[in-house]
Amino acid sequence: MLRNGDLTRGGITGTLLRFTLPMMAGSLLQQCYNIADTLIVGQCIGADALAAVGSAYTLMVFLISILLGLSIGSGTVFSLHYGAGNHSALRRSIFVSFVLIGAVTCVLNMAVFVWLDPILRLLQVPQDIYGMMRGYLWIIFCGIVFTFIYNFYAAMLRAVGDSVTPLWFLALSVALNIVLDLFFILQLDWGIEGAAIATVMAQGVASAGIVLYTWRKRPELRLHIGDMRFDRGSLKEIVSFSTLTCVQQSVMNFGILMIQGLVNSFGTAVMAACAAAVKIASFAYMPVQEFGNAFSTFIAQNFGAKRYGRIRRGVRSALLTTVIFSIIVSVLVFVFAEPLMLIFVHPGETEILATGVEYLRIEGAFYCGIGILFLLYGYYRAVRKPGMSVVLTVISLGTRVALSYLLAAIPSVGVTGIWWSIPIGWLLADAVGMLYYKMKNGA
């Protein structure tokens, strides 16, 4: 595992894996924030509460993806400057991006509080869970500043090769989240609001810890007065990368949000099944998503250092690693789909169980598709072509949304059509992205 890694030297596969493993572990722990809520809420409160948290999670991901996209885009710029050895440009970029993303966070927070009810009505949230979902989201977005701070500092540390430190603070936060969930729900009987409060408090601990560590232990990232200025070059670079990556994340999650509205129209049982299955699927393919992010950092550092031969070798190594890992995960999810669903739902809830198993087995058979797509996203960001990542996202999500509504309208297909639209969108975007890569690189 790397704490202060120069990704422009050393064996490619070993370097990538050592850098990626803490990020994979961190991504799984990140899912535990919502998994802890989902598991405890589903088992201790009931199916309605599970449906509320699951549907809320989709909206949370869409809105938080704006901040995440800005942080990912900024992190790519940080990696390019770090790989080129330009530390003064790195610090200027850190200042510009922090101010930019901080301002967006404030605007987003105000927008959520003003328009939360119209958004929930647009999503066709059933009345029997409307109040629970609204209360949960209100509390979650009171703590959105913690999400911004943690993601920003984590992106900054990873950009300079430290993938371990964000993991430790996240692990502490997840452990606290689970303890507080149990205390607030089982002991204080605060219900779904208690789960939201636990998540916000845990995220606050993670953000405070990572800020304090960076200030004390990483003086090269500490800003000086001379770094705190908006020079045109830094501002243009950050806005270009961050905006396009933000658009990519937003398009991705807006498409998912539209599909959530379609899922909601099938009733609470399908909503609950989808909520549980999405959490399982997120665990299953989140490692390849983080591998794609680590791969992007690797490519960006080497692109900044002009190590183009190493980039080509890295592409081949990453592709092979992703395919092997994805096949293993696909087999495991297909075989153990029912036991995995039983973690979240009671055995007697047969309709929820059957629907969730169907979702997992259809989507899970094609995890290679999403794994390769994450590599393509990371590659095009790192070589200063973030617009191509947006194009691939539009292809993937556009196909998914269109097919979902088309197939779900066929009585003999119904909700199953929504599940099939997911891998079809992945595979189509993969084909376009790989064809473009071969056209530009001749290999």
Show the residue positions of the predicted features:
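Small-residue-rich hydrophobic transmembrane alpha-helices
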Residues: L50-M110, T147-P166, A273-A337, I370-L392
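Short runs within selected transmembrane alpha-helices of multi-pass transporters and secretion channels
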Residues: S71, I139-R158, P166-V174, A195-I210, ...
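Helix-terminus/linker motif at the lipid-water interface of multi-pass membrane proteins
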Residues: L28, C32-L50, L120-Q127, F183-W190, ...
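Generic alpha-helical transmembrane segments of integral inner-membrane proteins
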Residues: M24, L28, C32, A36, ...
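Residue-level signal for short hydrophobic patches within transmembrane helices
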Residues: R9, T13-C32, A36, L59, ...
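Transmembrane helical elements of multi-pass membrane transporters/channels
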Residues: R18-D37, I139, Y150, S173, ...
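Small-residue hotspots at the loop-to-helix junctions and early N-terminal turns
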Residues: A47-T58, L137, A196, T268-F283, ...
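Short alpha-helical transmembrane segments in multi-pass integral membrane proteins
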Residues: M1-T20, F78-G143, Q187-T243, I299-F366, ...
